[in-house]
Amino acid sequence: MNHSQMFLQAQWVTPAREMTAPYFQAQFDCASALSGRLRISGLGFFSATLNGRPVSEDMFVPVWSDYEKREFLFDGAPFDEEFGHRIYGLSYDVSALLVPGQNTLLVHVTPGWYAQPTWVGGDQSAAYGRPRLCFALEYEDENGAHTLLSGPDTVVCRESEITAFDLFQGETQDYTRPLGAWERVRALEPFACEHLWQDCPADGVERRIAPRLLHQRDGLSVYDQGENVTGTPVLLGTEPGTITVIFSEALGADGLPDPEHHHGQKAIFHIREPRTLRAIGTWYGYRYFSVQGPAQVLCCEVIHSKVPVTSTFHAPEPTLQWLYDAFLRTQLANMHAGIPSDCPHLERRGYTGDGQLVCEAGMMLLGSRDFYRKWLRDIADCQDRKTGHMQYTAPYTRCGGGPGGWGCAIVQVPYQYYRQFGDAQPMREMYPQMLRWFDSLEAHSEGGLVTSDKPGLWCLGDWCMPGKPRIPEPLVNTYFYIRSLRQACAIAEILGIDGERDLLKARIAERENALYQHYYDPQTGDFAENAQGANAFMVDLGLGDARTLEHIAQRYAALGEYDTGIFGTDIVTRVLFERGHKALAAKLLTSCGASSYGHMRLTGATTLYEYWHGGRSYSHPMFGAPVRYLFQYLLGLRQAEGSCAWREIVFDPYLPEGINALSGSLETPQGVLRARLWRENGEARAEIFAPACINVHRRDTVC
């Protein structure tokens, strides 16, 4: 779809001078209205009212995408990677909002990701452009059909109450100054990129929390929501003055929001009469907040993408239950504007490493099909058309990562999307891009190992290990290359493509030989001294011998906790479950050691930490990937090899020693799957409830 197909002959408009978050207004006359439809997009984010009534409850729309090419320097030279670009529009039925006589359409456009400068290197930041709006309002009254198109002759603008804005750190809203007269707008050229109707869930207020007042001192009130979420407090400003709200994920020793964990997030309101106050153009990631000034706290609105929870899990063992609950809370807090982010405050980016790692869990446990379909487009857009190089984030903003664990999103996410939902179209569309990414990895390989990324970029292997990194980066990056090559072979078979499979298999063999040559010790059976899960990466590829696996089990039985980063934690857990060490895998999941989920729970966390021991962000989903093993290897609800859309499953439950009951459910494309495990007279038992259309292969034992 192009501009005219979406917006007819409407023009993009922007203020003639710089404005932070402008209001746009258009007025028109209507007789007795019969119907009306509004086609609209406002970049960065917009909200609209017609005759003072909201057009929609959607928030932070349109979803974030790589809108157009940005011009900036990358390490002193023009950034020359070529991406795909697209923008999203929305269509609303406004029939019930039209009135006889004069009608007023008011649109508030905030910077969002379009007008927010983001870091591009050194001390540079770059935005796409300034806030802009385009709409076509088609309506029918007793006099016939009419169309109101945005343009300099129909739209005016003025400043809004938002006088300072930073997507990451917050807003200043000033209700004491006059907004000024309406001003002319200027027209902009239309986007030449693809236009799509937004088919991804918007953000919205999903629930409300009544926060608890902890204490008051010197006019400062400190509140606790009881959980780490995203959204905004709703305040009632009671008298003229300035109200300052500071947000944090933790409290300091002084009982105030901890500066180490407030990430610069602040809201300032200037008022001269009582009014309700909340964030408008951004969200805050926080558990605690302080309020200074004349205000009452009414509630806290929890805001994220309108994605339902489609799973249940119940365990008397506290850490297993905490892991499920914390993952859902963390993942939902990181679903905004159509992307799965790394954290909801500091960076807010769609990191491909974090996203590919937890995508299977996100698809299994949440009603997220449309959400991930949109993010797949972002992943596809943010590959360099010339070299096949994959970015560390989608949409692209400069940041850190690695070629393997981050770049493999181009293969892993469409493959898991197919497995979960049975839709092969994203794989079909992206398969040529997978091959181009493989070519990019070949260009950054030496001696059969992936050893570098583009100059000026990081080349991470695993990430956020406790202590000093000891697992070699090339081992990890080559692991992901081999895994992706194997997945591409499976994808080619699913799609009926024969041409490249021999080449891909030859590359697999070459890379496996390189891992043996560089890292395998035939005297011990270990790879890279079994450091930080190195053996598990290799066993997962089918490399090594019996000693390689046994040394994994010995190491983690002795440690009693993890020593791995985000990728190794997932792989170690799965390798132990799949290769005869279920009890040990369960012990790691329930461990309360220093590097464990139990440690996070015991320190009061309600979401997953970025680092095992805390520090920086307290809301990072990346360590949550093993949550899916609660369903696949404990409840035993696992898709059969080669199955998609849950048409065929293996029911292979496991009830760990010391745990007397587990239960849970998954809403699949075939219907709801339920499993229950319990002990009766000391014997473990299990039952499954599955729709008749699912072919269930049941294993005999429960433990």
Predicted feature descriptions by range:
Residues 351-363, 372-373, 404-416, 474-489, ...:
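Well-ordered alpha-helical segments within folded domains of soluble proteins
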Residues 107-117, 121-136, 140, 560-592, ...:
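Repeat-solenoid scaffold signature
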Residues 134, 149-176, 198-199, 254, ...:
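Non-catalytic C-terminal accessory modules of carbohydrate-active enzymes
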Residues 489-505, 570, 580:
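Carbohydrate-binding surfaces of carbohydrate-active enzymes
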Residues 524, 555-563, 594-597:
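Solenoid-like repeat scaffolds
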Residues 1-345, 370-373, 390-396, 425, ...:
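Extracellular/oxidizing-compartment recognition motifs
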Residues 45, 297-326, 330-333, 339-391, ...:
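Active-site acid/base region of carbohydrate-active enzymes
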Residues 231-238, 242-249, 289, 354-382, ...:
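Alpha-helical support elements that line or immediately flank enzyme active sites
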